């Protein structure tokens, strides 16, 4: 299933709904009239269906019941209420926890530290404790394979002196050409690959404030991280839940 559909399906499953009707995937390899997302001939069952509602075609994606989820936050109190202050994004951890809990499954939460019950600021809590079945404390919890990055988590702001000039190669030329298509006031989605350099080139040119770049994982604004760190953003203006981010894209 497409990334956004999977994120939205977690929310749909949590609500006890059967599936999602979406225009996403029509006419692509996800469309059952093409290949239905099947990788090879071993997969025979059509999981996705074409449906007509009021004369318009939609793809129907059924909910896949979830039994277990392993999610990560930064701090949890002894009753399982958890905050995510050192995480890069919230992605769909809340929706997954709700979906698994409401399906009678097991929600396992990994955190860096444990604090006394009721001491977390309520607006910082992203996962309510009644959804959590088990807590694992890992004090050396690393955000990335090379350790946490407080710029990615939004604790630090990078000024212009921190901007690294990208080498003038094919990737930069393509990113610069793509930047030329962006108009003031645009809101864009930056995908993985060469597109991850657009934000950096915009900062080099001093035009980063003329438009807003977003990433599927939730960041809004700022400059996207590149390569294996893609999905993170430096100087993000906001961080959305991933299902909400895709709601905006799809609409």
Model-derived regions, located:
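Conserved alpha/beta enzyme-core scaffold
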Residues: 1-251
């Amino acid at each position: 299933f497409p990334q956004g559909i999977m994120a939205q399906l977690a929310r749909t499953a949590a609500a006890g709904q059967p599936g999602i009707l979406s225009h996403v995937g029509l006419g692509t390899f996800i469309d059952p009239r093409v290949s239905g997302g099947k990788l090879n001939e071993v997969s025979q069952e059509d999981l996705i269906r074409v449906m007509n509602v009021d004369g318009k075609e939609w793809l129907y994606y059924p909910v896949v019941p979830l039994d277990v989820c392993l999610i990560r936050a930064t701090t949890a109190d002894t009753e399982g209420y958890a905050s995510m202050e050192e995480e890069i994004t919230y992605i769909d951890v809340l929706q997954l926890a709700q979906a698994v809990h409401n399906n009678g499954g097991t929600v396992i939460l990994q955190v860096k530290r444990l604090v006394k019950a009721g001491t977390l600021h309520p607006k910082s809590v992203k996962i309510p404790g009644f959804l959590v079945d088990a807590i694992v404390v890992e004090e050396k919890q690393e955000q990335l394979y090379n350790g946490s990055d407080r710029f990615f988590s939004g604790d630090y702001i990078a000024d212009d002196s921190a901007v690294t000039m990208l080498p003038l190669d094919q990737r930069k030329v393509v990113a610069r050409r793509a930047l030329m298509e962006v108009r003031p006031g645009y809101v864009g989605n930056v995908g993985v690959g060469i597109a991850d350099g657009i934000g950096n080139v915009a900062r080099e040119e001093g035009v980063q404030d003329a438009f807003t770049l977003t990433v599927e994982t939730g960041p809004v604004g700022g400059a996207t991280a590149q390569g294996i760190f893609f999905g993170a953003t430096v100087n993000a203006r906001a961080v959305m839940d991933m299902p909400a981010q895709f709601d905006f894209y799809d609409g």
